[in-house]
Design a protein with these regions (language model features):
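Glycine-rich phosphate/pyrophosphate-binding loop and the adjoining helix
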Residues: 1, 24, 29, 62, ...
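N-terminal beta1-alpha1 ligand-phosphate binding loop
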Residues: 2-30
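Hydrophobic residues within alpha-helices
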Residues: 19-27, 93, 131, 176
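Helix-loop-strand module that forms the ligand-binding subsite of alpha/beta enzymes
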Residues: 60-146
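Cysteine-centered iron-sulfur cluster-binding motifs in ferredoxin-type domains/subunits
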Residues: 8-17, 45-54, 77
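N-terminal beta-loop-helix "entrance" segment that forms/cooperates
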Residues: 39-58, 154-161
Length: 184
């Protein structure tokens, strides 16, 4: 089994990366393979709404990094999306992925999705809701934890001081692993 973790934050290796890797630790303990993608390293243009992707399983526009990232999403059993807010790159990924999935029905069906946010104080629920709506609209299964899938902190590393939030991420990783084993 494989889980792709996508850091939508513009801050590479910041708080969002820390919480995704915290979830990865729990998945790795159960023998689940993980791969980390930093969207800050990937150029993703907005969707052109050409619908040429219909029946092809991926976007036909190959001048940016979307097709490679989406191929990894399709090939994974589970997907973690993380963003402090819905960053422009995350928004482009969700928009284009949404169109590709809509015209290629079932391509993401029954995959497991987890949305997480690392925030200073506010905005996390909007980000988590947006990413969860992507999952649910594409017939995916969404894993939850003991509380909202958010951790608080501003400066890089501050999220590690949010003991409750980090414990929640660990629990989320354990829940994700349990669900993946039941699905597979």
């Amino acid at each position: 089994m494989k889980v792709i973790g996508i850091n939508g934050s513009s801050r590479k290796d910041g708080n969002t990366a820390i919480i995704i890797r915290t979830i990865f630790e729990e998945l790795n303990k159960r023998g689940i393979e993980t791969e980390f993608i930093q969207l800050a390293d990937v150029d993703i243009e907005p969707c052109r709404a050409c619908f040429a992707c219909k029946g092809k399983g991926n976007c036909v526009f190959r001048k940016d990094g979307f097709a490679e990232v989406f191929s990894k999403i399709v090939g994974a059993d589970g997907i973690i999306l993380g963003s402090a807010d819905v960053s422009s790159r995350m928004k482009a990924l969700l928009d284009r992925g949404g169109v590709v999935a809509a015209v290629n029905p079932g391509i993401l069906k029954h995959k497991l999705g987890v949305a997480v946010a690392a925030v200073r104080r506010a905005g996390g629920m909007t980000a988590v809701d947006t990413m969860n709506h992507f999952f649910l609209n594409k017939e995916m299964i969404v894993a939850g934890s003991t509380y909202w899938n958010m951790v608080y902190g501003r400066e890089i590393g501050d999220v590690l001081k949010d003991n409750e939030g980090i414990a929640n991420m660990r629990n989320l990783g354990q829940n994700m692993a349990s669900i993946l084993f039941k699905l597979n």
